[in-house]
């Protein structure tokens, strides 16, 4: 094929740019399309099909949704722990990883060990994007990210008047600009 005929074929949209496809010698051989040949071929493949655990025909339910581990459709589970030593804290982290809410009652621990335990579990809670809340004296609530924690007692204690007063004080302080530290006392008058 010459260059001009190839260009014409491209412009015309001819799918076969080369006429060489017809020149290839393929030995087509004989194909046996009889039902007996098809049955023997399928019986030869039958042991392979039975051994295939990923066969789509076996137990296909029509859904390809896979549940996340630790999430159940039942009610949320809360784990109450009253540890006596810091060695019990990995159980609290494991419960959080299983998406369980953990309430730690640290009244049985020494104050320095209790502080260490709270820091440890708070770090684990932060790592899984969870929430923490102090419930009472030495009692803490740690929740995974799938649980929403609201504190209604804290919301009732704050009043809008206090918030408004804080906003007014902040805006009054912001209107007075402090003098820069590099400016000399006499230079401000110039």
From Swiss-Prot:
GO terms for cellular component: cytoplasm. It is found in: Cytoplasm. Keywords: Cell cycle, Cell division, Cytoplasm, Septation. InterPro entries: Cell_div_SepF (IPR023052), Cell_div_SepF/SepF-rel (IPR007561), SepF-like_sf (IPR038594). Signal peptide: none annotated. Its main location: cytoplasm. It comes from the Bacteria. One of its GO terms (biological process) is FtsZ-dependent cytokinesis. The keyword Cell membrane does not apply. Belongs to the SepF family. Cell division protein that is part of the divisome complex and is recruited early to the Z-ring. Probably stimulates Z-ring formation, perhaps through the cross-linking of FtsZ protofilaments. Its function overlaps with FtsA. Homodimer. Interacts with FtsZ. This is Cell division protein SepF. The lineage of its organism: Bacteria, Bacillati, Cyanobacteriota, Cyanophyceae, Synechococcales.
């Amino acid at each position: 094929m010459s260059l001009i005929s190839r260009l014409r074929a491209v412009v015309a949209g001819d799918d076969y740019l080369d006429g060489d496809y017809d020149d290839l010698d393929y030995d087509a051989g004989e194909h046996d399309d009889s039902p007996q040949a098809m049955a023997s071929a399928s019986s030869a493949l039958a042991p392979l099909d039975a051994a295939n655990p990923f066969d789509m025909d076996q137990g296909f339910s029509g859904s390809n949704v896979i549940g996340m581990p630790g999430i159940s459709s039942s009610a949320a589970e809360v784990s109450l722990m009253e540890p006596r030593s810091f060695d019990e804290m990995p159980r609290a982290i494991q419960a959080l990883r299983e998406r369980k809410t953990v309430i730690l009652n640290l009244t049985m621990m020494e104050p320095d060990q209790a502080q260490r335990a709270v820091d440890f579990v708070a770090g684990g809670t932060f790592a899984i994007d969870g929430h923490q809340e102090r419930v009472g004296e030495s009692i803490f609530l740690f929740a995974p990210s799938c649980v929403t924690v609201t504190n209604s007692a804290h919301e009732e204690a704050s009043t809008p008047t206090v918030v408004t007063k804080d906003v007014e004080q902040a805006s009054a302080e912001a209107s007075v600009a402090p003098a820069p530290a590099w400016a000399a006392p006499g230079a401000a008058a110039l």
